[in-house]
Amino acid sequence: GVNLALGKNLVGAFHQPRLVIADTATLATLPPRELRAGWAEVAKHGLLQGELWTWCEAHGPAAVAGDPAALAHAVLESCRLKAGVVAADEREESEEGGRALLNLGHTFGHALEAECGYGGGLLHGEAVAIGLALAASLSARLGHCAQELPGRIIEHLHGVGLPATLSDLPRRFSAERLVARMRKDKKARDGAMRFVLTRGAGECFTAGDVPPEAVEKLLRDEGCDA
């Protein structure tokens, strides 16, 4: 997808590759911050799949430290999960769940990225990490998941060196501006925000009926200005 000033991934097309080669040895060439940022997507896949989340909690620190076996397992399982989801809903046409589930954490994350300007101050994975924790917090507030899940996610993300809360960032954000960004997210329908929420690891779902005031209150409680 192509980023615009209005938001992330707003322009794009569907063209499937003939072959995907994943040479995990090349991960050793990444700066540590970039490798940690990539882990946010693995953690997301873990929260979507359940068993992978348990593995992430146990092996995440080793993976971001560059352990070849841990990295290979993370890449393999992430590709396996994403391929299955995309094959079942290639063009994201499913009304419920489907490919949209891969956007767990991204509604919040894309808004944060857009506010920061895509200049490298906040990497995509760092924004997604914070988005995962916020999505879990929103889920808990709405009564969908256990109250301890957000803290468990934050603990894991901090444990691998990722930001997980808005207070981890050096600047403050406006709740109103972030919500305005989320209304323009590619998952939005007629200006209504859609989120991927969770009932627990392995039990994620899409929701288009989240009250905007609940989102704004969450953001203010997390440290945003009004």
Regions found by a protein language model. Name each.
Residues 1-62:
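A glycine/threonine-rich phosphate-anchoring loop and its flanking beta-alpha core
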Residues 9, 18-20, 126-129, 194:
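Structural motif
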Residues 19, 25-26, 38-45, 55, ...:
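Alpha-helical scaffold segments in soluble metabolic enzymes
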Residues 32, 36, 49-56, 68, ...:
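Alpha-helix initiation and N-capping motif
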Residues 40-43, 144-226:
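C-terminal charged capping/lid subdomain of soluble metabolic enzymes
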Residues 59-176:
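Active-site segments that bind and position negatively charged phosphate/pyrophosphate groups
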